[in-house]
Amino acid sequence: MSEIKLGIIGGGQLGSMLSEAARKLNIKTIIYCDDPNAPAKNFCDDFIYAEYNNKEKIYEFAKKVDVITYEFENIPFDTLSELNKLKPVSPKPSVNRLIQHRLAEKDFINKLNIRTTRYVLIKSKEELLPLEDFLPGILK
């Protein structure tokens, strides 16, 4: 059986932990990150530093891996979609698009009958004032 190469987009703490866990399973990891000093650089087998919209580097990354995942939600949707044409990306880019928008994410979860905290969309300061019953609360 040939060695598995896992591509991880993002090089933070989760990328570091994923690389460490993969190593225990004899899975090679290649990190793609826009931070040249990312913590995961110290734990992976290969590291590609580039902006997330650098098509040349994205293709270089895809050639080196068998499957791709990402460690945080702020990867551009277009980048993940392009990668998904080249190699399997998990979670799918459509999931990434959903989790980038907190209101859409909450609405989706509630449609699955999974309870979340109460929430409301506020578009202006005037809409905030009558919402005293939501306090204390978090404004995002």
Regions found by a protein language model. Give the residues of each.
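ATP-binding N-terminal substructure of ATP-dependent carboxylate-amine bond-forming enzymes
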Residues: 1-100, 104
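Active-site nucleotide/adenylate-binding loops and adjacent lid/helix of ATP-dependent enzymes
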Residues: 98-140
